[in-house]
């Protein structure tokens, strides 16, 4: 009942941002973006939107995966595909609001790519690397505010946990084993086996710990999901703990 109440609140709030009748600006502000000046860009955008009295939310999101081109700004405007701009500074940010959000000039010189297929602007799927990607775990990264649970739930978040709580723990482990899911570390250890070992360990009290620095030393490979979509991690831990 509590989840359904949360879901009924979250979905309309997310749909407000998906509303195609107004512009929405997203700013990548994970560690990679902040190191390149994303917080200053975020503030410049908010100041310009406020100065011009525009109904245009400016939202802080996580890492889209193109760290080499930070700071990234995504603008969704009616009549245009969602457009991602790279290496944005405060001057460019103000220009994007003036010329594109308020006007009709997409500012092609700053465009990195479109987030959807269209006939106007090359999309990310045309990139040699991105064309082969199908994001699953990282699908929300760079598209939602990681600090807003409504954004996560509005995109189907915690639905898997709700389903899992209606199953027996043994049944969940069986499903994970059948899926072939493996850990994200270098060993690729089967997740279902790991859960089964933990479940069979002696003692009633058990602990589930998140290793926030998995992978190659110093690479911080799990940064993206920790910063950009933490509720995905929390949902997985809740299912594993159950």
Segments the model singles out, each with a brief description of its role:
Residues 1-242:
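Feature of Fe-S/electron-transfer and energy-metabolism proteins
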């Amino acid at each position: 009942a509590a989840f359904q109440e949360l879901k009924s609140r979250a979905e309309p709030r997310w749909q407000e941002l998906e509303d195609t009748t107004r512009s929405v600006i997203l700013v990548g502000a994970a560690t990679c973006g902040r190191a390149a000046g994303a917080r200053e860009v975020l503030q410049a955008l908010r100041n310009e939107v406020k100065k011009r009295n525009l109904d245009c939310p400016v939202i802080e999101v996580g890492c889209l995966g193109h760290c080499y081109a930070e700071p990234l700004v995504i603008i969704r405007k009616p009549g245009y595909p969602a457009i991602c701009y790279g290496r944005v500074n405060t001057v460019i940010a103000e220009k994007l609001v003036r010329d594109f959000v308020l006007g009709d000039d997409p500012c092609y010189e700053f465009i990195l790519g479109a987030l959807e297929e269209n006939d106007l602007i090359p999309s990310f799927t045309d990139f040699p690397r991105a064309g082969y990607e199908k994001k699953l775990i990282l699908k929300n990264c760079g598209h939602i505010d990681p600090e807003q649970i409504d954004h996560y739930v509005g995109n189907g978040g915690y639905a898997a946990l709700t389903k899992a709580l209606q199953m027996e723990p043994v049944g969940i482990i069986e499903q994970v084993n059948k899926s072939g899911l493996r850990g994200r570390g270098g060993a690729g250890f089967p997740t279902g086996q790991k859960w089964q070992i933990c479940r069979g360990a002696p003692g009633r009290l058990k602990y589930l710990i998140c290793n926030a620095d998995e992978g190659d030393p110093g690479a911080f490979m799990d940064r993206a999901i920790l910063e950009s979509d933490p509720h995905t991690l929390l949902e997985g831990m809740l299912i594993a703990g159950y």
